UniProtKB/Swiss-Prot annotation:
Molecular function GO terms recorded: alkanesulfonate monooxygenase activity; uracil oxygenase activity
Database matches in InterPro entries: Luciferase-like_dom, Luciferase-like_sf, Pyrimidine_monooxygenase_RutA, SsuD_RutA_monooxygenase
Listed GO biological process terms: alkanesulfonate catabolic process; nitrogen utilization; uracil catabolic process
Keyword annotations of the record: Flavoprotein, FMN, Monooxygenase, NADP, Oxidoreductase
Protein name: Pyrimidine monooxygenase RutA
Catalyzed reaction equations: uracil + FMNH2 + NADH + O2 = (Z)-3-ureidoacrylate + FMN + NAD(+) + H2O + H(+); thymine + FMNH2 + NADH + O2 = (Z)-2-methylureidoacrylate + FMN + NAD(+) + H2O + H(+)
Organism (species): Rhizobium rhizogenes (strain K84 / ATCC BAA-868) (Agrobacterium radiobacter)
Family indicated by similarity: Belongs to the NtaA/SnaA/DszA monooxygenase family. RutA subfamily.
Superkingdom field: Bacteria
Enzyme Commission number, as recorded: 1.14.99.46
Positions contributing to FMN binding: 49-50, 115, 124, 140-141, 190
Function: The FMN-N(5)-oxide reacts spontaneously with NADH to produce FMN. Requires the flavin reductase RutF to regenerate FMN in vivo.
Length: 363
């Protein structure tokens, strides 16, 4: 099973809580996290894109770096780990993104891939006059399908002449093309999102579900397998979890309870309002899960809480779900979390025994 880190490109990571660590994003912070991840054999890191935050007392995600420029910097200081940037496709033309990706492919010597998002938070785009109207919610994966087609045309052939509803290419050219196969990620959970991933993506990210229920995402993985059976493509599910670990189960649980007690209700309310704005896509979108009141303090991602031994056992259950390729991890404290994972959790994981020779050779 592959393991990646969802690096904190926005302030405070993924905890909307006054009791959680408070910090601003920086290149140095993300470099430290990424170099630790590379040292301990993590397979990849991914950064999101967020153009407007949720406010509140913690100013949640009001402070964000830009994904491509961050990953280009990380590409220059790493040697092995794979790097994924996120394209805000509503404001970044596909031909430009294709060239940016090819450039980072050159910097990283073939270690770069791309996460495509449609854009679900209207104020991110309306603030700069680039929101296409709420009818976009119903067409966003049609838009993304054309977008991905242009990318693939340019990366694979160096040319695109796509004439679609959203994009009109006229002998559009790209050179140099990427030296490595450019992997594409999507995080679709709706029916339309799953169908997009089955047709265009190499990996589909889905949310873990609940607390210490590492296999509860299985229905999402099964839906993806049904979708890929229709396209005949091999697309793996990668699952998003937050790890809150400590020496004992009790100590880890105390941290989790404290984070919930300090929930930033103003920021959570903003998330709920934005989640309700999409009335076109149905009830199975990621944003609907993120805004659910059950655990909005960490946007309702699957949460693993416990001792280092407990976390290792829980993560070993994940790859037993058919169609699972890996996990994408966040931490309450990223620097300490990645260090503890590399030294105290991963060595106990049966599904990570294959990396031990690599780590021993690097010592």
């Amino acid at each position: 099973m592959e393991i990646g880190v969802f690096i904190p490109i926005g302030n405070n990571g993924w905890l909307l809580s006054e009791n959680a660590p408070q910090y601003k994003p920086s290149f140095e912070l993300n470099k430290e996290i990424t170099l630790k991840a590379e040292k301990y054999g993590f397979d990849f890191v991914l950064s999101m894109i967020k153009l407007r935050g949720f406010g509140g007392k913690t100013e949640f995600w009001d402070h964000n770096l830009e994904s491509f420029t961050l990953m280009s910097g990380l590409a220059a200081v790493t040697t092995r780990i794979k790097l994924f940037a996120t394209a805000a496709t509503l404001v970044m033309p596909p031909a430009i993104v294709a060239r940016m990706a090819s450039t980072i492919d050159s910097i990283s010597n073939g270690r770069f891939g791309l996460n495509l998002v449609t854009g679900w938070q209207r104020p991110e785009y309306s603030q700069m006059g680039m929101w296409p109207g709420d009818e976009y919610f119903a067409k966003r994966y049609d838009y993304l399908g054309e977008y991905a087609t242009v990318l693939r045309d340019l990366w694979e052939t160096g040319k695109s002449d796509l004439k679609g509803e959203f994009f009109q290419m006229d002998d559009c050219r790209l050179s140099p093309r990427p030296q490595a196969d450019m992997k594409v990620i999507c995080a679709g959970s709706s029916t339309a999102g799953m169908e997009f991933s089955a047709q265009y993506a190499d990996y589909n990210f889905c949310f873990g579900v609940g607390v210490n229920t590492p296999k509860a995402f299985a229905p999402a993985a099964e839906r993806l397998q049904v979708a890929t059976a229709k396209t005949g493509r091999d697309v793996s599910s990668f699952v998003l979890f937050m790890v809150i670990a400590d020496e004992t189960d009790e100590a880890a649980r105390a941290k989790w309870e404290s984070y919930k007690d300090g929930a930033d209700q103003e920021a959570i309310a903003w998330l709920g309002v934005q989640g309700a704005a999409d009335t076109k896509s149905g009830s199975d979108t990621n944003i609907r899960q993120m805004a659910d009141s059950v655990s909005a303090v960490n946007i309702n991602m699957g949460t693993l809480v416990g001792s280092y031994e407990t976390i290792a056992k829980l993560l070993d259950e994940v790859p037993t779900v058919p169609g699972t390729g890996g996990v994408l991890l966040t931490f309450d404290d990223f620097v300490k979390g990645v260090e503890d994972f590399g030294t105290k959790i991963q060595p106990l994981m049966k599904c990570r025994e294959h990396i031990k020779p690599m780590l021993e050779a690097a010592e």
